[in-house]
Amino acid sequence: MDTSLPFLAGKNPFDIHVYFEANDKEKAATLKRKLMARFDWLKEGRWNDRAGRISPHPMPMFEMFGGDPKSIAKVNDVIEWLKKNRGGFSILVHPNTTYGNVKDHSVHAVWLGEPVGIRFWVFHIQTAIKIGLVLTIGTYAIRSIL
């Protein structure tokens, strides 16, 4: 990963998303434990095993963060370890830069394994909500279901 990108101040410099099928939940949990043991400076993110939720991530996954801004210097070590130990899972490693979510999850991202179809439209909805737009689908305000 390009470590010279303009990273966002005050945010984790990079995220790791490990995607898994529902029947591989235990195997994914084992990978997460190994990842945390090997890189104890990573921060634990969310565990989302509910596919179909309104999210840019189309399938179950767990997330880890490079917590400290200095951790960006170590991201390529994590990527190399994951290449050897990913256990067949599709993994997305992306920076959090001033370029925004769409570019961070596409142009600047590193995929290990088969890429999954990121739902980029969700980022656009999230941006609309941030700037105060209220979008409705049927009788539901988008703000209430994200």
Task: Enumerate the predicted regions with their spans.
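N-terminal, charge-rich interaction modules
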Residues: M1-E26
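Short amphipathic alpha-helix segments
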Residues: E26-K43
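Short amphipathic alpha-helical segments
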Residues: N23, K27, L31, K70-K74
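Short, intrinsically disordered low-complexity segments
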Residues: F39-K84
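Broad gene-expression machinery/nucleic-acid interaction feature
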Residues: P13-D15, M61, G88
